[in-house]
Amino acid sequence: MKITLQNLGKRYNREWIFRHIEYEFIVGKKYAITGSNGSGKSTLLQVIAGSLMHNEGNVEISSQQWAVGSGQLANTTKNKHQTISNEQHYQYISIATPYLELIEEMTALEMLRFHSTFKQLILPAAEILQIVNLQASANKQIRYYSSGMKQRLKLALAFFSKTPILLLDEPTTNLDEDGIALYHQLIKNYTTNKLVIVCSNDKQEYSFCEEALEMGRYK
């Protein structure tokens, strides 16, 4: 599986946020999108995720060996080089961002189970909450969670979905030291064979990444 950006550009009104991005992200590798505040990092991630439209160029997701919903690479060759339609992109992508809204009337347990109706989870909801240390608040409405607890839940929804692509925007926002340690443990234990893209200007959030796309090059 890979994501290919072809001459990609995004503007608001007449101002270009970025232009002429040519880049390829490949499954099994971890990438950082870096740059100063206002450089377009989050905008690019939203374009890749399909939640924002671009103004020029193309975002192509192609499946080579990933079987959707299986959580693993397939051995067959029939899916190689298959381009995925824009309408199906969401099936392959999980995302955690500061601007992602949770349904605050739900409990964490309800939120995970609701999420699983759209994307399979790799573990039972109760076990996931234990891993992210939210088991004691599993039946508490999310509206009563602290900002750090909400961020742990956002990470849980993203990391434990059966998708080959994981997008993370400022993933340690609102996390304390224990939360940051949890984030790195999740990266270590649950991203094997995934395509991971971390959007950040904080090196501790992407220190494990093998390549970086610097947004300052595409103004």
Describe each region flagged by the PLM.
Residues 3, 18-20:
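Conserved structural motif at the start of ABC-family nucleotide-binding domains
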Residues 37, 169, 176:
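ABC-family nucleotide-binding domains
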Residues 49:
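Helix-to-loop junction immediately C-terminal to a conserved catalytic motif
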Residues 57-66, 73-91:
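Conserved ABC transporter NBD signature motif
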Residues 99, 104-119:
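Q-loop/switch helix immediately C-terminal to the Walker
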Residues 113, 123-137:
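Conserved ABC ATPase "signature" region
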Residues 155:
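Hydrophobic anchor residue at the start of the ABC signature
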